[in-house]
Amino acid sequence: AAANALDYDDLVARAVHLLANDAPLRARLQARYRWISVDEYQDVNLAQYRLLRLLAGEDEAAANLCVIGDPDQAIYGFRGADRGYFLRFRRDYPAAVEVRLSRSYRSSQVILAAAQQVIARSPDWSALRIWSEFASTVKVDLYRAPTDRAEAEYVVHQIEQMVGGTSYFSLDSGRVDDPSAARTFGDFAVLYRLGAQSQPLIEAFARSGIPF
């Protein structure tokens, strides 16, 4: 406020306030945006849902609103997102047609089975069984590291084992078993949630001579 600036949440809140209190403007925008499609609907919060209702119109029969999302991927609760808006959408638009897509074109069945074992523990699980035609014999390993640096060293160790070592020290110290392993560095990807989590990995890769 001191800088006379608005962030994203402010823009949504201002838009909601304006549309809720200016009927002629609301009517013009509803006429302009006759079809509304929302992706990643599981990330919607109260202000965003209110904005959708104002734009689409609260006449359920006249609204042309399509929402796409997965309630089992709702991870933004810390900023107000609520998977409960799937239920509210059904209540506010009872004539809406629900289409459930259960086939995954991204992941193998091994990955999907592991994910569903975790998600199924939630009392809010949607009970949608995802399946894939991608077969895989590779198992999912779970490693709980005591610190972020220990985690980075574990990642380095796994890569070294699968490429056959990155130095003579790797061989002499017994960190690798087979120096003739067929993997290359280009076969690996390390995924992390936040950019801040990359620093221990960068340092561990640099120490071990792993290009990235």
Regions found by a protein language model. Give the residues of each.
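Helicase P-loop NTPase motor core
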Residues: P94-V97, S102-P211
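Active-site catalytic pocket residues across diverse enzymes, especially alpha/beta-hydrolases
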Residues: L55-D59, Y93, F205
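Conserved helicase NTPase motor core
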Residues: A1-R88, R100-S107
